[in-house]
Protein backbone atom coordinates (compact mmCIF):
# COMPACT_ATOMS: atom_id res chain seq x y z
CA UNK A 1 0.00 0.00 0.00
CA UNK A 2 1.31 3.48 -0.84
CA UNK A 3 1.61 5.88 2.12
CA UNK A 4 -1.78 6.24 3.69
CA UNK A 5 -3.74 4.55 0.90
CA UNK A 6 -6.57 3.25 3.02
CA UNK A 7 -7.48 -0.38 3.47
CA UNK A 8 -10.54 -0.76 1.25
CA UNK A 9 -13.01 -3.62 1.75
CA UNK A 10 -11.64 -5.63 -1.16
CA UNK A 11 -8.09 -5.04 0.09
CA UNK A 12 -9.01 -6.28 3.55
CA UNK A 13 -10.67 -9.42 2.22
CA UNK A 14 -7.56 -10.27 0.18
CA UNK A 15 -5.34 -9.48 3.13
CA UNK A 16 -7.26 -11.89 5.33
CA UNK A 17 -7.21 -14.64 2.75
CA UNK A 18 -3.43 -14.20 2.45
CA UNK A 19 -3.09 -14.20 6.22
CA UNK A 20 -5.29 -17.26 6.64
CA UNK A 21 -7.66 -15.48 9.04
CA UNK A 22 -10.24 -17.81 10.44
CA UNK A 23 -7.67 -20.59 10.76
CA UNK A 24 -6.13 -18.95 13.79
CA UNK A 25 -3.74 -21.00 15.95
CA UNK A 26 -4.46 -21.17 19.68
CA UNK A 27 -2.56 -18.46 21.60
CA UNK A 28 -0.45 -18.39 24.67
CA UNK A 29 -1.68 -21.67 26.12
CA UNK A 30 1.39 -23.47 27.42
CA UNK A 31 2.73 -26.45 25.56
CA UNK A 32 3.07 -27.29 21.90
CA UNK A 33 2.07 -24.09 20.13
CA UNK A 34 4.85 -21.63 19.28
CA UNK A 35 4.60 -18.31 21.10
CA UNK A 36 2.91 -15.49 19.19
CA UNK A 37 4.82 -12.47 17.95
CA UNK A 38 3.48 -9.08 19.10
CA UNK A 39 3.19 -5.66 17.47
CA UNK A 40 2.26 -2.68 19.66
CA UNK A 41 1.36 0.58 17.92
CA UNK A 42 1.02 3.39 20.48
CA UNK A 43 0.00 6.83 19.28
CA UNK A 44 -0.19 10.11 21.21
CA UNK A 45 -3.44 11.85 22.21
CA UNK A 46 -6.15 9.71 20.57
CA UNK A 47 -9.55 9.95 22.28
CA UNK A 48 -10.64 6.35 22.90
CA UNK A 49 -14.31 7.25 22.38
CA UNK A 50 -13.64 7.55 18.63
CA UNK A 51 -13.41 3.74 18.44
CA UNK A 52 -17.10 3.11 19.21
CA UNK A 53 -20.56 4.68 18.82
CA UNK A 54 -21.32 7.60 18.70
CA UNK A 55 -17.74 8.94 18.52
CA UNK A 56 -16.95 6.70 15.55
CA UNK A 57 -19.54 8.60 13.45
CA UNK A 58 -17.31 11.68 13.25
CA UNK A 59 -14.40 10.28 11.22
CA UNK A 60 -13.54 7.35 8.96
CA UNK A 61 -11.02 5.06 10.71
CA UNK A 62 -10.84 1.91 8.51
CA UNK A 63 -7.83 0.29 10.22
CA UNK A 64 -9.42 0.58 13.65
CA UNK A 65 -12.65 -0.83 12.15
CA UNK A 66 -10.63 -3.71 10.70
CA UNK A 67 -9.23 -4.50 14.16
CA UNK A 68 -12.76 -4.38 15.60
CA UNK A 69 -14.00 -6.79 12.91
CA UNK A 70 -11.21 -9.32 13.45
CA UNK A 71 -10.38 -8.70 17.09
CA UNK A 72 -11.49 -7.24 20.41
CA UNK A 73 -12.31 -3.65 21.40
CA UNK A 74 -12.09 -2.43 25.00
CA UNK A 75 -14.91 0.06 25.63
CA UNK A 76 -13.49 1.42 28.90
CA UNK A 77 -9.70 1.67 28.67
CA UNK A 78 -7.95 4.48 30.56
CA UNK A 79 -4.58 6.13 30.87
CA UNK A 80 -2.97 5.93 34.32
CA UNK A 81 -1.81 9.54 34.00
CA UNK A 82 -3.13 11.87 31.28
CA UNK A 83 0.21 13.25 30.04
CA UNK A 84 2.93 11.79 27.81
CA UNK A 85 5.86 10.67 29.97
CA UNK A 86 4.07 9.54 33.19
CA UNK A 87 1.50 7.62 31.13
CA UNK A 88 4.19 5.82 29.15
CA UNK A 89 6.14 5.14 32.35
CA UNK A 90 3.05 3.29 33.65
CA UNK A 91 2.68 1.33 30.39
CA UNK A 92 6.34 0.26 30.24
CA UNK A 93 6.61 -0.55 33.98
CA UNK A 94 3.16 -1.98 34.76
CA UNK A 95 3.10 0.25 37.86
CA UNK A 96 0.89 3.16 38.93
CA UNK A 97 2.33 6.67 38.73
CA UNK A 98 2.72 7.13 42.48
CA UNK A 99 4.86 3.95 42.57
CA UNK A 100 7.24 5.03 39.77
CA UNK A 101 7.09 8.67 41.00
CA UNK A 102 6.71 9.89 37.40
CA UNK A 103 5.38 13.23 38.55
CA UNK A 104 5.58 15.22 35.30
CA UNK A 105 6.91 15.12 31.73
CA UNK A 106 10.46 15.62 33.04
CA UNK A 107 10.28 12.78 35.60
CA UNK A 108 9.75 9.27 34.25
CA UNK A 109 11.50 5.92 34.72
CA UNK A 110 15.26 5.65 35.26
CA UNK A 111 17.07 4.95 31.97
CA UNK A 112 18.05 1.38 33.01
CA UNK A 113 14.54 0.36 34.16
CA UNK A 114 13.59 -3.25 33.21
CA UNK A 115 10.56 -3.04 30.92
CA UNK A 116 8.36 -5.82 29.54
CA UNK A 117 10.36 -5.58 26.30
CA UNK A 118 13.62 -6.25 28.17
CA UNK A 119 12.07 -9.34 29.79
CA UNK A 120 10.74 -10.59 26.45
CA UNK A 121 14.19 -10.20 24.90
CA UNK A 122 15.72 -12.10 27.82
CA UNK A 123 13.18 -14.90 27.19
CA UNK A 124 14.01 -15.39 23.53
CA UNK A 125 12.02 -12.71 21.69
CA UNK A 126 13.64 -10.61 18.99
CA UNK A 127 12.81 -6.98 19.88
CA UNK A 128 12.59 -3.83 17.77
CA UNK A 129 11.46 -0.25 18.54
CA UNK A 130 10.73 2.68 16.24
CA UNK A 131 9.43 6.18 16.97
CA UNK A 132 8.34 7.91 20.15
CA UNK A 133 9.19 6.20 23.45
CA UNK A 134 9.21 9.01 26.06
CA UNK A 135 9.05 6.98 29.27
CA UNK A 136 12.41 7.93 30.87
CA UNK A 137 13.37 11.03 32.88
CA UNK A 138 15.08 14.15 31.58
CA UNK A 139 13.10 15.09 28.46
CA UNK A 140 10.64 17.83 27.37
CA UNK A 141 11.17 21.58 27.55
CA UNK A 142 12.42 23.71 30.45
CA UNK A 143 9.03 25.49 30.37
CA UNK A 144 7.24 22.21 30.83
CA UNK A 145 9.08 21.26 34.00
CA UNK A 146 9.12 24.78 35.53
CA UNK A 147 5.35 25.09 34.98
CA UNK A 148 4.87 21.77 36.79
CA UNK A 149 7.14 22.76 39.69
CA UNK A 150 5.47 26.17 40.18
CA UNK A 151 1.84 25.07 39.98
CA UNK A 152 1.45 25.73 43.75
CA UNK A 153 2.52 29.38 43.36
CA UNK A 154 -0.32 31.90 43.68
CA UNK A 155 -0.25 33.30 40.17
CA UNK A 156 -2.14 32.64 36.96
CA UNK A 157 -0.26 32.79 33.64
CA UNK A 158 -1.09 31.62 30.15
CA UNK A 159 1.36 28.84 29.29
CA UNK A 160 0.18 27.88 25.80
CA UNK A 161 -0.64 29.51 22.50
CA UNK A 162 -4.34 29.88 21.80
CA UNK A 163 -5.57 26.67 20.11
CA UNK A 164 -5.86 27.15 16.35
CA UNK A 165 -6.06 25.25 13.06
CA UNK A 166 -3.78 25.22 10.03
CA UNK A 167 -4.58 23.64 6.66
CA UNK A 168 -1.56 22.57 4.62
CA UNK A 169 -1.06 21.19 1.12
CA UNK A 170 -3.81 19.98 -1.22
CA UNK A 171 -5.99 16.90 -1.71
CA UNK A 172 -2.89 14.93 -2.75
CA UNK A 173 -1.00 15.69 0.48
CA UNK A 174 -1.19 12.41 2.41
CA UNK A 175 1.97 12.51 4.48
CA UNK A 176 1.45 15.52 6.70
CA UNK A 177 3.24 14.23 9.83
CA UNK A 178 6.42 13.24 8.00
CA UNK A 179 8.43 12.05 11.03
CA UNK A 180 5.68 9.55 11.91
CA UNK A 181 5.51 8.33 8.31
CA UNK A 182 9.29 7.79 8.26
CA UNK A 183 9.05 5.66 11.42
CA UNK A 184 6.06 3.77 9.97
CA UNK A 185 8.10 3.08 6.80
CA UNK A 186 11.00 1.81 8.93
CA UNK A 187 8.63 -0.54 10.79
CA UNK A 188 7.06 -1.76 7.52
CA UNK A 189 10.50 -2.40 5.99
CA UNK A 190 11.62 -4.20 9.12
CA UNK A 191 8.56 -6.49 8.97
CA UNK A 192 9.13 -7.25 5.27
CA UNK A 193 12.92 -7.62 5.38
CA UNK A 194 13.78 -8.82 8.91
CA UNK A 195 10.74 -10.16 10.78
CA UNK A 196 9.72 -12.42 7.91
CA UNK A 197 13.07 -14.29 8.17
CA UNK A 198 13.18 -14.70 11.94
CA UNK A 199 13.06 -18.17 13.46
CA UNK A 200 12.15 -16.80 16.90
CA UNK A 201 9.03 -14.78 17.83
CA UNK A 202 9.41 -10.99 17.74
CA UNK A 203 7.96 -7.97 19.49
CA UNK A 204 7.80 -4.73 17.49
CA UNK A 205 6.90 -1.34 18.99
CA UNK A 206 5.95 1.68 16.89
CA UNK A 207 5.41 5.00 18.70
CA UNK A 208 3.58 7.77 16.81
CA UNK A 209 3.42 11.49 17.65
CA UNK A 210 0.05 11.96 15.97
CA UNK A 211 -2.65 13.03 16.69
CA UNK A 212 -0.82 15.28 19.21
CA UNK A 213 -1.22 18.95 18.21
CA UNK A 214 1.74 20.64 16.50
CA UNK A 215 4.04 23.36 17.92
CA UNK A 216 2.91 27.00 17.78
CA UNK A 217 6.21 28.85 17.24
CA UNK A 218 4.76 32.29 18.10
CA UNK A 219 4.17 31.16 21.70
CA UNK A 220 7.67 31.56 23.17
CA UNK A 221 10.41 29.22 24.46
CA UNK A 222 10.05 25.73 23.03
CA UNK A 223 6.55 26.96 22.09
CA UNK A 224 3.41 25.28 23.21
CA UNK A 225 1.78 22.79 20.88
CA UNK A 226 -1.58 24.33 20.20
CA UNK A 227 -1.88 23.99 16.40
CA UNK A 228 -4.18 21.38 14.87
CA UNK A 229 -2.65 20.81 11.43
CA UNK A 230 -3.87 18.65 8.55
CA UNK A 231 -4.39 18.56 4.78
CA UNK A 232 -7.61 18.55 2.70
CA UNK A 233 -6.97 14.82 2.02
CA UNK A 234 -7.58 13.95 5.68
CA UNK A 235 -10.19 16.61 6.34
CA UNK A 236 -12.39 14.85 3.75
CA UNK A 237 -12.49 11.80 6.06
CA UNK A 238 -14.35 13.88 8.69
CA UNK A 239 -18.15 13.97 8.90
CA UNK A 240 -18.73 17.63 9.84
CA UNK A 241 -22.45 17.02 10.50
CA UNK A 242 -21.60 14.55 13.27
CA UNK A 243 -19.25 16.92 15.12
CA UNK A 244 -20.66 17.78 18.51
CA UNK A 245 -20.09 21.30 19.84
CA UNK A 246 -19.38 20.83 23.56
CA UNK A 247 -21.39 22.70 26.18
CA UNK A 248 -19.33 24.97 28.44
CA UNK A 249 -20.21 26.23 31.90
CA UNK A 250 -19.61 29.93 32.54
CA UNK A 251 -16.13 30.72 33.86
CA UNK A 252 -17.56 31.50 37.31
CA UNK A 253 -19.25 28.06 37.52
CA UNK A 254 -16.12 26.06 36.66
CA UNK A 255 -14.46 23.77 39.19
CA UNK A 256 -11.42 25.76 40.48
CA UNK A 257 -8.92 23.27 39.05
CA UNK A 258 -10.70 23.34 35.66
CA UNK A 259 -10.53 27.14 35.68
CA UNK A 260 -6.76 27.05 36.31
CA UNK A 261 -6.36 24.50 33.47
CA UNK A 262 -8.50 26.48 31.07
CA UNK A 263 -6.66 29.72 31.86
CA UNK A 264 -3.12 28.29 31.61
CA UNK A 265 -4.10 26.59 28.32
CA UNK A 266 -5.21 29.98 26.97
CA UNK A 267 -8.83 28.88 26.54
CA UNK A 268 -10.72 31.40 28.70
CA UNK A 269 -11.13 33.92 25.84
CA UNK A 270 -14.01 34.01 23.36
CA UNK A 271 -14.30 31.18 20.81
CA UNK A 272 -16.94 31.09 18.08
CA UNK A 273 -18.81 27.84 17.39
CA UNK A 274 -17.05 27.79 14.02
CA UNK A 275 -13.61 27.91 15.70
CA UNK A 276 -14.53 25.08 18.08
CA UNK A 277 -15.98 22.97 15.26
CA UNK A 278 -12.83 23.48 13.17
CA UNK A 279 -10.47 22.56 16.01
CA UNK A 280 -12.45 19.35 16.51
CA UNK A 281 -12.61 18.59 12.78
CA UNK A 282 -8.88 19.10 12.28
CA UNK A 283 -8.18 16.92 15.32
CA UNK A 284 -10.36 14.13 13.87
CA UNK A 285 -8.53 14.48 10.52
CA UNK A 286 -5.24 14.00 12.40
CA UNK A 287 -6.75 10.82 13.91
CA UNK A 288 -7.54 9.60 10.36
CA UNK A 289 -3.89 10.06 9.36
CA UNK A 290 -2.85 8.10 12.48
CA UNK A 291 -5.25 5.30 11.52
CA UNK A 292 -3.63 5.07 8.08
CA UNK A 293 -0.24 4.41 9.66
CA UNK A 294 -1.76 1.58 11.69
CA UNK A 295 -3.16 0.29 8.38
CA UNK A 296 0.34 0.20 6.85
CA UNK A 297 1.55 -2.05 9.69
CA UNK A 298 -1.44 -4.41 9.42
CA UNK A 299 -0.96 -4.60 5.62
CA UNK A 300 2.75 -5.40 5.97
CA UNK A 301 1.91 -8.23 8.39
CA UNK A 302 -0.74 -9.49 5.95
CA UNK A 303 1.55 -9.26 2.89
CA UNK A 304 4.23 -11.34 4.65
CA UNK A 305 1.83 -13.97 6.07
CA UNK A 306 2.75 -12.92 9.62
CA UNK A 307 -0.68 -11.56 10.56
CA UNK A 308 -2.11 -14.92 11.63
CA UNK A 309 0.86 -15.54 13.97
CA UNK A 310 0.98 -12.05 15.48
CA UNK A 311 -0.96 -10.31 18.25
CA UNK A 312 -1.53 -6.68 17.18
CA UNK A 313 -2.30 -4.10 19.90
CA UNK A 314 -3.28 -0.48 19.25
CA UNK A 315 -3.52 2.15 22.00
CA UNK A 316 -2.56 5.72 23.00
CA UNK A 317 -0.88 7.37 25.97
CA UNK A 318 -3.97 9.55 26.65
CA UNK A 319 -6.73 11.38 24.78
CA UNK A 320 -7.35 14.97 23.65
CA UNK A 321 -10.08 17.30 24.96
CA UNK A 322 -10.37 19.18 21.63
CA UNK A 323 -12.23 22.06 23.35
CA UNK A 324 -14.46 19.96 25.60
CA UNK A 325 -14.73 21.55 29.06
CA UNK A 326 -13.21 24.71 27.56
CA UNK A 327 -9.81 23.04 27.18
CA UNK A 328 -7.60 21.42 24.60
CA UNK A 329 -4.72 18.99 25.29
CA UNK A 330 -4.96 16.44 28.11
CA UNK A 331 -3.99 16.86 31.82
CA UNK A 332 -7.58 16.23 32.87
CA UNK A 333 -9.67 13.32 34.13
CA UNK A 334 -12.57 14.09 31.79
CA UNK A 335 -13.26 11.34 29.24
CA UNK A 336 -11.78 13.18 26.26
CA UNK A 337 -8.42 13.27 28.04
CA UNK A 338 -8.36 10.04 30.10
CA UNK A 339 -10.21 7.50 27.90
CA UNK A 340 -7.81 5.72 25.51
CA UNK A 341 -8.31 3.40 22.54
CA UNK A 342 -7.41 -0.25 23.13
CA UNK A 343 -7.87 -2.85 20.40
CA UNK A 344 -6.29 -6.30 20.14
CA UNK A 345 -6.37 -8.86 17.33
CA UNK A 346 -4.42 -12.04 16.74
CA UNK A 347 -4.20 -15.77 17.44
CA UNK A 348 -7.14 -16.91 19.59
CA UNK A 349 -8.26 -13.36 20.37
CA UNK A 350 -12.03 -13.39 20.08
CA UNK A 351 -13.36 -11.60 16.98
CA UNK A 352 -15.99 -8.84 17.04
CA UNK A 353 -15.87 -8.76 20.82
CA UNK A 354 -16.53 -5.58 22.81
CA UNK A 355 -15.39 -5.69 26.43
CA UNK A 356 -17.07 -3.34 28.92
CA UNK A 357 -14.68 -4.03 31.85
CA UNK A 358 -12.54 -1.09 32.98
CA UNK A 359 -8.86 -1.63 32.08
CA UNK A 360 -5.83 0.66 31.91
CA UNK A 361 -2.36 0.98 30.40
CA UNK A 362 -0.62 -0.77 33.34
CA UNK A 363 -2.32 -3.92 32.01
CA UNK A 364 -0.05 -3.92 28.92
CA UNK A 365 3.01 -5.15 30.89
CA UNK A 366 1.44 -8.35 32.33
CA UNK A 367 -0.37 -8.97 29.02
CA UNK A 368 2.93 -8.91 27.11
CA UNK A 369 4.48 -11.35 29.59
CA UNK A 370 1.39 -13.58 29.39
CA UNK A 371 1.63 -13.75 25.58
CA UNK A 372 5.33 -14.63 25.90
CA UNK A 373 4.56 -17.19 28.66
CA UNK A 374 6.86 -15.43 31.11
CA UNK A 375 5.86 -15.63 34.81
CA UNK A 376 4.14 -12.38 35.81
CA UNK A 377 5.67 -10.57 38.84
CA UNK A 378 3.24 -10.27 41.76
CA UNK A 379 4.06 -6.60 42.48
CA UNK A 380 2.56 -5.15 39.29
CA UNK A 381 -0.35 -2.69 39.38
CA UNK A 382 -1.78 -4.16 36.17
CA UNK A 383 -3.49 -7.45 35.29
CA UNK A 384 -3.16 -9.51 32.11
CA UNK A 385 -5.85 -8.87 29.50
CA UNK A 386 -5.54 -12.44 28.13
CA UNK A 387 -8.41 -13.86 30.24
CA UNK A 388 -10.74 -11.16 28.86
CA UNK A 389 -9.44 -11.47 25.28
CA UNK A 390 -9.67 -15.27 25.18
CA UNK A 391 -12.63 -15.73 27.55
CA UNK A 392 -10.68 -17.73 30.12
CA UNK A 393 -11.68 -17.71 33.75
CA UNK A 394 -9.45 -15.58 35.98
CA UNK A 395 -8.55 -18.54 38.22
CA UNK A 396 -6.93 -20.33 35.26
CA UNK A 397 -4.51 -17.47 34.89
CA UNK A 398 -3.86 -15.18 37.84
CA UNK A 399 -2.67 -16.36 41.24
CA UNK A 400 -3.43 -12.79 42.37
CA UNK A 401 -7.17 -13.43 42.10
CA UNK A 402 -9.67 -11.54 39.96
CA UNK A 403 -8.96 -8.19 38.34
CA UNK A 404 -10.37 -5.27 40.39
CA UNK A 405 -13.60 -3.59 39.24
CA UNK A 406 -11.92 -0.15 39.20
CA UNK A 407 -9.06 1.64 37.45
CA UNK A 408 -6.86 4.42 38.82
CA UNK A 409 -5.53 7.48 37.02
CA UNK A 410 -3.56 10.27 38.68
CA UNK A 411 -1.95 13.53 37.58
CA UNK A 412 0.74 15.70 39.17
CA UNK A 413 2.11 17.82 36.30
CA UNK A 414 1.69 21.19 34.59
CA UNK A 415 -1.55 23.09 33.76
CA UNK A 416 -3.25 21.72 36.90
CA UNK A 417 -2.75 23.39 40.30
CA UNK A 418 -3.36 20.29 42.43
CA UNK A 419 -2.55 16.60 42.34
CA UNK A 420 -5.65 14.71 41.20
CA UNK A 421 -6.76 11.10 41.45
CA UNK A 422 -9.49 9.43 39.44
CA UNK A 423 -11.22 6.18 40.33
CA UNK A 424 -13.45 4.77 37.59
CA UNK A 425 -15.81 1.91 38.52
CA UNK A 426 -19.23 0.87 37.20
CA UNK A 427 -21.11 3.97 36.08
CA UNK A 428 -19.15 6.27 38.42
CA UNK A 429 -16.13 8.46 37.98
CA UNK A 430 -14.77 9.89 41.23
CA UNK A 431 -12.04 12.57 41.19
CA UNK A 432 -10.28 13.56 44.42
CA UNK A 433 -7.81 16.41 44.72
CA UNK A 434 -4.76 17.30 46.81
CA UNK A 435 -5.30 16.34 50.48
CA UNK A 436 -8.97 15.41 50.03
CA UNK A 437 -10.20 18.52 51.88
CA UNK A 438 -8.84 21.75 50.43
CA UNK A 439 -10.34 21.17 46.95
CA UNK A 440 -13.87 19.81 46.45
CA UNK A 441 -14.09 16.36 44.83
CA UNK A 442 -16.07 15.57 41.68
CA UNK A 443 -18.42 12.68 41.01
CA UNK A 444 -19.94 11.94 37.61
CA UNK A 445 -22.57 9.38 36.63
CA UNK A 446 -21.29 8.46 33.16
CA UNK A 447 -24.49 6.60 32.26
CA UNK A 448 -26.80 9.57 32.92
CA UNK A 449 -24.21 12.25 32.11
CA UNK A 450 -21.66 10.99 29.54
CA UNK A 451 -20.47 14.55 28.86
CA UNK A 452 -19.61 15.04 32.56
CA UNK A 453 -21.42 18.35 32.91
CA UNK A 454 -22.98 17.78 36.35
CA UNK A 455 -20.86 17.13 39.44
CA UNK A 456 -23.14 15.08 41.74
CA UNK A 457 -20.68 14.71 44.65
CA UNK A 458 -22.89 16.75 47.04
CA UNK A 459 -26.00 14.82 45.96
CA UNK A 460 -24.48 11.37 46.68
CA UNK A 461 -22.32 11.65 49.85
CA UNK A 462 -22.57 7.91 50.57
CA UNK A 463 -21.18 7.02 47.11
CA UNK A 464 -18.41 9.62 47.54
CA UNK A 465 -17.50 8.16 50.92
CA UNK A 466 -17.35 4.57 49.63
CA UNK A 467 -15.35 5.48 46.49
CA UNK A 468 -12.96 7.62 48.52
CA UNK A 469 -12.43 4.66 50.84
CA UNK A 470 -11.51 2.42 47.86
CA UNK A 471 -9.22 5.14 46.50
CA UNK A 472 -7.40 5.48 49.83
CA UNK A 473 -6.96 1.69 50.01
CA UNK A 474 -5.10 1.88 46.66
CA UNK A 475 -3.12 5.07 47.24
CA UNK A 476 -2.59 7.24 50.33
CA UNK A 477 -3.31 10.26 48.17
CA UNK A 478 -2.94 13.05 50.78
CA UNK A 479 0.57 11.71 51.49
CA UNK A 480 1.43 11.44 47.77
CA UNK A 481 0.19 15.01 47.14
CA UNK A 482 2.42 16.22 49.98
CA UNK A 483 5.45 14.38 48.50
CA UNK A 484 4.85 15.98 45.09
CA UNK A 485 4.57 19.38 46.78
CA UNK A 486 8.00 18.89 48.41
CA UNK A 487 9.52 17.48 45.20
CA UNK A 488 8.34 20.52 43.19
CA UNK A 489 9.88 22.95 45.65
CA UNK A 490 13.22 21.10 45.87
CA UNK A 491 13.49 20.80 42.08
CA UNK A 492 12.70 24.47 41.58
CA UNK A 493 15.24 25.61 44.18
CA UNK A 494 18.06 23.57 42.64
CA UNK A 495 17.11 24.78 39.13
CA UNK A 496 17.06 28.41 40.33
CA UNK A 497 20.48 28.02 42.00
CA UNK A 498 21.95 26.46 38.84
CA UNK A 499 21.04 29.60 36.85
CA UNK A 500 22.73 32.08 39.21
CA UNK A 501 22.60 35.63 37.78
CA UNK A 502 20.58 34.47 34.74
CA UNK A 503 17.54 33.34 36.74
CA UNK A 504 15.38 36.46 36.20
CA UNK A 505 15.89 36.56 32.47
CA UNK A 506 15.46 32.79 31.94
CA UNK A 507 12.24 32.50 33.97
CA UNK A 508 10.77 35.57 32.27
CA UNK A 509 11.25 34.09 28.81
CA UNK A 510 9.63 30.71 29.23
CA UNK A 511 6.30 29.84 27.55
CA UNK A 512 4.47 32.27 29.84
CA UNK A 513 6.64 35.23 28.70
CA UNK A 514 3.74 37.25 27.24
CA UNK A 515 2.06 37.50 30.64
CA UNK A 516 5.19 37.42 32.80
CA UNK A 517 6.90 40.41 31.18
CA UNK A 518 3.89 42.65 31.92
CA UNK A 519 4.43 42.34 35.70
CA UNK A 520 7.80 40.69 36.16
CA UNK A 521 8.40 41.81 39.77
CA UNK A 522 4.95 40.67 40.93
CA UNK A 523 5.50 37.11 39.65
CA UNK A 524 9.04 36.85 41.04
CA UNK A 525 7.71 38.00 44.43
CA UNK A 526 4.96 35.35 44.31
CA UNK A 527 7.64 32.69 43.81
CA UNK A 528 9.78 34.07 46.65
CA UNK A 529 6.75 33.98 48.93
CA UNK A 530 6.06 30.34 47.98
CA UNK A 531 9.69 29.38 48.65
PLM-predicted stretches and their roles:
Residues 68, 90-186, 190-196, 217-219, ...:
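Catalytic-site neighborhoods of secreted/periplasmic enzymes
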Residues 14-31:
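N-terminal signal peptide
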Residues 36-37, 58-62, 111-118, 178-188, ...:
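A structural signal for well-ordered alpha-helical segments within the folded catalytic domains
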Amino acid sequence: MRGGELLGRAGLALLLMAAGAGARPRPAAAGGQPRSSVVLVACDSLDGRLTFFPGNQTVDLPSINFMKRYGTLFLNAYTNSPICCPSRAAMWSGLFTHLTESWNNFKGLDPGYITWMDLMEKHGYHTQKFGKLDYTSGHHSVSNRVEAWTRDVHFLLRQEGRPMVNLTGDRKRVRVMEADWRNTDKAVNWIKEEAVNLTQPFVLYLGLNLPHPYPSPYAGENFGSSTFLTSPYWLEKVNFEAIKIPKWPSLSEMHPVDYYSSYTKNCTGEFTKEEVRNIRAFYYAMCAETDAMLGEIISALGDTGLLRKTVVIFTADHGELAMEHRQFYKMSMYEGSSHVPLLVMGPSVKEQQEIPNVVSLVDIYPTMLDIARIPIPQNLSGYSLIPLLCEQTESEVSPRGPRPSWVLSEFHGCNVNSSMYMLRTGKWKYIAYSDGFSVLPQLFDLTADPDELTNVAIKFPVIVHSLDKILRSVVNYPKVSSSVHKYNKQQFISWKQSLGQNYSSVIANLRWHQDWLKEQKKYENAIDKWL
